[in-house]
Amino acid sequence: MTVSSTVQPLKACVPEATEAADMPHHTLSKSMTFANLDQYQYWHAVGPMLGRMLSNGSYSIHKQYEYLCLFAHVIIPKLGPFPGGRDIYKCLLGGTGSVELSQNVQKLGLTARVAFEPTSYIASTGVDPLNRHTVHATLVELRAIGSASIDMELHQMLVNELTLTDREERLMSPEAISGTAWKTQILLALDLGQTGITIKEYFYPALKASVTGQSVAKLCFSAIRKVDKQGRFEPASKAIETYMKTQSQTDLYFLSCDLVDPAATRIKLYLMELDMRLAKVEEHWTMGGKLNDEETLLGLKMLQELWVEFGIIEGMRNEPERPSLPGDPDTIVPFIMNYEMSPGEALPKPKFYFPLVGIPELKIANVLTAFFERYGMPEQAAVYRNNLQTPSKDLVIATDHQAWLSFSYTKKKGPYLTMYYH
């Protein structure tokens, strides 16, 4: 979700094949050079889809070129080796290698997003096996460009609270490091707004929790209180902390914040739930009945509708040991929730993440088209399925492109959805 940017009305068509030669990605490819084959592969594997998202989101032609150039010159060099059967560092994201595209959908229109884990070849050679040493340089470079608005203070305060220090990394044996399924500790996400970029940082404290013997929840709440000297987040944070103490089988998963002035940021706390039942979703959405206002309950009604229409299969899930892959069944992935805290707000706002891997693409598109029609989003209903079509995807049989769907609701903005593409 963008903090300050505005979005424009949707474009009611997808460029035809005859127009592909005029699209910015194709034009830039004629004169774009790269330092190595990995960067070339990322550009041609991910760039075309990013280009379509910008075009379909009615970005100005100038913004399309600006953001594609940013992707090529700033982001791609920070993605490390391109995946392809080699024994390389594996990112937590389920997109292509170290990058994942997503798109915010709301009544006002579409916003493209790029999430990635800054990395380099040294994460694969053993020099930086836990990939700790690329993110800071990436943030400095992003701050230097004119497109992005970024405040480094929260990064500087949170990085040692939620990720391994040098001393803590030395406590891990080489065998423990190599045997760790998830090594990701930080991700970045860029909301590509119509007027500029907002940057979010995601902290995954599981490694630090393991080394220090603390729970992820304890690390997160402690970190929030250390950076929140004015107590702006204390009421909402305390409400979440109290609720999480009732969940004996569920810990927090990760924390995110907007890299803006700490007084204006939002902080989100995420949990991963293996109990894949609608009753458990309802419990988390309302925080056991603590969130019972009209807005929250109307959002829950919409969530329940989507749950039924997607045909989510209920039951216990296993904790995933890898990102989802094409061909995985629709019973492999648990669900994720987050609680968004805003300065001065007494209670958080819930957001739910539907795992969609294994569900046919056409079914997902049809469910969302009908949802948009029901809730006053006719432009989205008119174009969603067409925007999804690509020459390489048959929506009737594909089951791996639309991987996750987040959902939240407020009276002010209405339904707010983000589709994560793999």
UniProtKB/Swiss-Prot annotation:
Residues annotated as binding substrate: E100, Y204
A GO BP entry: alkaloid metabolic process
Induction of the gene: Expression is decreased in presence of phenylacetic acid (PAA).
Description of the deletion phenotype: Leads to a drastic reduction of both roquefortine C and meleagrin synthesis. Accumulates high lebels of HTD.
Top-level taxon of origin: Eukaryota
Pathway(s) it belongs to: Alkaloid biosynthesis
Residues that, per the record, bind dimethylallyl diphosphate: R113, K200, Y202, K268, Y270, Y353, Y416, Y420
NCBIfam families in the cross-refs: arom_pren_DMATS (TIGR03429)
Protein name (record): Roquefortine prenyltransferase roqD
Name of the gene encoding the protein in the UniProt record: roqD
